[in-house]
């Protein structure tokens, strides 16, 4: 999102239960897509709910499990939507199976980000934007 959406959007990534390190498979997907993958770290979404955190306009949960969790109260009341994808870190099997799961997750997110970035934000009101980001998560 930060790369494709600049300068309008700056994206952050965090999770409800961070693993402590960014998975190498995730870093490889970024590399394959020619996206920056340096300096990334595993972090809790609580980091973005604290005073002094960057102001969020949109928050997208992506882990299928996150839809059932209680999310933090985000400062500034950003629009939220669930864009669930199967957790590639939960995949077992061969190295090819795991790599395929990460590739599939990347492709799903990339498609949704593209749809989001194509929204005519300036001509939509808040309710219409909320409806659109929710619809994108169902695709």
Model regions: which residues?
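Conserved active-site segments centered on acidic
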Residues: 1-50
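Structural signal for conserved beta-strand scaffold positions within catalytic alpha/beta enzyme cores
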Residues: 13, 61, 81-84
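Generic detector of well-ordered secondary structure
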Residues: 32, 62, 110-111
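Alpha-helix C-terminal capping/helix-to-coil transition sites in glycosyltransferase folds
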Residues: 54-55
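Short glycine-rich anion-binding loops that position phosphate/pyrophosphate groups of nucleotides
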Residues: 64-67
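Phosphate-binding/catalytic loops
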Residues: 70-139
